[in-house]
Amino acid sequence: MSDKLPYKVADISLAAWGRKALDLAENEMPGLMHMREMYSASKPLKGARIAGCLHMTVETAVLIETLVALGAEVRWSSCNIFSTQDHAAAAIAKAGIPVYAWKGETDEEYLWCIEQTLYFKDGPLNMILDDGGDLTNLIHTKYPQLLSGIRGISEETTTGVHNLYKMMAKGILKVPAINVNDSVTKSKFDNLYGCRESLIDGIKRATDVMIAGKVAVVAGYGDVGKGCAQALRGFGARVIITEIDPINALQAAMEGYEVTTMDEACQEGNIFVTTTGCTDIILGQHFEQMKDDAIVCNIGHFDVEIDVKWLNENAVEKVNIKPQVDRYLLKNGRRIILLAEGRLVNLGCAMGHPSFVMSNSFTNQVLAQIELWTHPDKYPVGVHFLPKKLDEAVAEAHLGKLNVKLTKLTEKQAQYLGVSREGPFKPDHYRY
């Protein structure tokens, strides 16, 4: 089916702009450039037909071209209807790589785009690179006949990893998977430092609101929530956290944040950010108690955290201010400003995470694809992690760009600590 349409993007004439953006990003993505230097000659991904379902951004374009440089064939779709950067998609299409993504897809178009990535000229996909689990779920439910030919899955994000573990527990996961999200150089960098910058970018571009002096409510205090809370506090907001986990709640309290329930916080907040990866976080009962023109947004993967359906069914009026910014008039006379329709605000209203931090995440993705493709015997059906040594290698590949100088252990010190001078330096159970 995909032979009839080599790509589908919003505007192929944006390719030149996209290429310039890629050139800039490459200089900020030392990990991926290091992968090209190490593996372009040996082509460890030769024969791999990778179907990718991950936000079609400039940074993802650099990842795609890295996979191709390492020998893979690639077909791509975005994992969110609003996250595609159309100039990046155009640049990839112009380079001859099949991509099916544009900003503002309908749900039906979104599914169609994913389905275009399943068949290559030499046969169906044999590798999956996923973000959120939609591609993985589609193959397992609608195209199970393709499963036997798939060597592995690498999963990018917390939500997708939860999905893999749920599938494994139910006995329905049929393909080995690597949990990229919980590599230290992903979760402790992308989730934390990436969100710390891109959340504010999304809110500011959408509303131009003054954050200083406001009350911001952050639902969830995992790595994403921590980054969001730091950013909002840094801009002068008073931050309130909501949490279900006593450990995370205690962490938030020890950092000086007020921790309470959404039932209480909804009356205080001016800005609300959901980061939980769970459903039903902000409901109609909360909207009804919010202040006038409260800003509500989500930075978790799916649009299930905010009850947008309630707003659409119960608001007196909905006014679109500009793309991805809607103002709802409630029956009580107060207004709610909803960003990105409750989907990822940093990608719907801004450009997502900066290139440098995405280089960390995507270098892990490349290594995971190489591991699964070249060492299939090491990975039975299940959810696996990249070795600690590779995690450290990803970090080291990014140090030079920041002029970081590592201290080198002496042989005596290494023996004292019981580690190799070359690493890994921490046990697998170490919590960074």
From Swiss-Prot:
NCBIfam families: ahcY, PRK05476.2-3. It is an enzyme of class 3 (hydrolase). Residues 183-350 are annotated as: NAD binding. The modification Phosphotyrosine is found at Y193. PROSITE patterns: ADOHCYASE_1, ADOHCYASE_2. SUPFAM superfamilies: Formate/glycerate dehydrogenase catalytic domain-like, NAD(P)-binding Rossmann-fold domains. It catalyses: S-adenosyl-L-homocysteine + H2O = L-homocysteine + adenosine. Substrate binds at T57, D131, E156, K186, D190. Homotetramer. Interaction with AHCYL1. Pathway: Amino-acid biosynthesis; L-homocysteine biosynthesis; L-homocysteine from S-adenosyl-L-homocysteine: step 1/1. Binds 1 NAD(+) per subunit. Belongs to the adenosylhomocysteinase family. Catalyzes the hydrolysis of S-adenosyl-L-homocysteine to form adenosine and homocysteine. Binds copper ions. Its main location: cytoplasm. Pfam families: AdoHcyase, AdoHcyase_NAD. InterPro entries: Adenosylhomocyst_ase-like_sf, Adenosylhomocysteinase-like, Ado_hCys_hydrolase_NAD-bd, NAD(P)-bd_dom_sf, S-Ado-L-homoCys_hydrolase_CS. One of its GO terms (cellular component) is nucleus. This is Adenosylhomocysteinase. Its EC number is 3.13.2.1. It comes from Bos taurus (Bovine). Coiled coil: none annotated. Keywords: Acetylation, Copper, Cytoplasm, Endoplasmic reticulum, Hydrolase, Hydroxylation, NAD, Nucleus, One-carbon metabolism, Phosphoprotein. GO terms for biological process: one-carbon metabolic process; S-adenosylmethionine cycle. The modification N6-(2-hydroxyisobutyryl)lysine is found at K186.
